[in-house]
Amino acid sequence: MRHSIRLTAALLLAFIACFSFPLSAMALEGEYIAIRKEGAGRIALVLGKPLAEGGKASAWSAELDREIREGLAFTGIFNMIPPPLNLFETGGSGKRTLNFGALNSIGAEIFAGGSLASEAGRVKLSMAVYETFGAKPILSKTYSGRPDELRTIAHAFCADLVKLLTGRRSVFGSNIVFVSNRSGFKEIYSCAFDGGSLSQLTRSRSISLTPALSPDGTRLAFTDYTSGRPGLKIMNMADRRISAVRQSGVSIDPGWRSNGEVATTLSFEGDQDIYLVRPDGTLSRKVTSSRGIDLSPSFSPDGTKMAFVSARFGNPQVFILDLGTGQTRRLTYNGNYNTQPSWSPGGDKIAYTTMEKNGEINIFTIRPDGSGATRLTSGARENESPSWSPGGDMIVFTSGRQGQKKLYVMNANGDNQRRLLQMEGEQMQPSWSFIP
């Protein structure tokens, strides 16, 4: 129930009323945005457990606290530190207030806390966030929903906090689609950003590969082998109906352009080149032409350029095509084998897979002008298939570091690598986006 959550500005947080915090009676997001630069250290955060106002709210408090903590920890941008013993102090009037001196003494940059109540059978979570050095309130907001939506309520607050502190769209509410052979067939599955809410999308009992979510998350393009040869299919994510995009020859490895067109590799003219296909399945135009196979299209956010893989000079390398001028230039030169480009949502980097001279397969990022090639993974087997989070602050990828191929996530700079979900079989070829 993503759409049933109600977010409203808090006039006066019950949490604040309990402890007499100095906060004006208004939501304050927008008055304070501390943009966290890429590569900066983690934000030191003290998180107070939501104070339950008795009754049903007491039963919800522990679960909401856990969901908020796990959600914020997943982002990799927070250093969660325990609160000081003297978190509150009592003034001359006998009122309890936040002890900002104590928070500063333990290195806390941000404090977040709130109250929890039951109102007409619904959960009401009121949260307040402070920048501790200046004792400045930076966010006041109330979130409400049904009791079975505690996870979504918690993530709504997490999303607001991350947006406030980084200026970027967060991962909360986003989804990852991927391929798994858990059932004995290669089918496409989806899960929440943190590996929860696992769902099987295709049931072809055949081979489904290279899933690609559209930028708005409403459609899923993938390669399907049900007919015996690879063909392009598109799933409507609202009702999960699947339609075939019928073209003669082979159709593989789709990628979405911002205008709704799908780029895919077709072979009906002999060579395997990349074509643009309209939403109705008709051909728009051919965009690459070479003797070697061209595949793995990934577009810049504005849709004017396309990164792709070509073996036109021998080994596969990543190229960039300007769709306006038709000019193509080679992007990658490190390693003997460069594939699977994924253009970042901000447009400033492209992640890709490299086979290095020592035989290791690792993930790199590079700027679109060819500078700044940076290795993100190392010392592990078969790191491949990178896909950016919608905000560009994380990457999901496939790794065989524990034997079978599994999904992992990491920060955009390669930090905080960890396995995404526990699931039987192998998981591969992830694509990350929001699904309405």
Swiss-Prot record:
Transmembrane segments: none annotated. Residues 1-27 form the signal peptide. It holds the Pfam family PD40. Coiled coil: none annotated. InterPro entries: 6-blade_b-propeller_TolB-like, PD40. Keywords: Periplasm, Signal. Gene3D superfamilies: TolB, C-terminal domain (2.120.10.30), TolB, N-terminal domain (3.40.50.10070). It is found in: Periplasm. It comes from the Bacteria. Its main location: periplasm. GO terms for cellular component: periplasmic space. Belongs to the TolB family. This is Protein TolB homolog. The lineage of its organism: Bacteria, Pseudomonadati, Chlorobiota, Chlorobiia, Chlorobiales.
